[in-house]
UniProtKB/Swiss-Prot annotation:
Coiled coil: none annotated. Together with the chaperonin GroEL, plays an essential role in assisting protein folding. The GroEL-GroES system forms a nano-cage that allows encapsulation of the non-native substrate proteins and provides a physical environment optimized to promote and accelerate protein folding. GroES binds to the apical surface of the GroEL ring, thereby capping the opening of the GroEL channel. Its main location: cytoplasm. Belongs to the GroES chaperonin family. GO terms for biological process: chaperone cofactor-dependent protein refolding. It comes from Neorickettsia sennetsu. This is Co-chaperonin GroES.
Amino acid sequence: MKVGLKMLHDQVLIRPHEEKDGAGGIYIPDSAKKKPTMGLVVAVGAGAKNSNGTFQPVCVKEGDIVLYRKWAGSEVEHDGVEYVVMKETDIIAIKEGK
């Protein structure tokens, strides 16, 4: 999925998985919904230099489903789509399998 944004350094662009309506189609107001903590990686930076000056590439790749810290990153909108931009270190895990 190309979004027309190039991430820099160790930044990762994630499209959060949206919460579905409540059981039986009950409407859940935005204020009561949980903040997503899982999403699809849509763009990644090339990496960053670590403390000893060597280049460290990013471990995640486009298409990965990741679990991230609840309040990580910054919410951004691009072309009408909501994303979260965060540092790779705010990603906790990569989902394996289908």
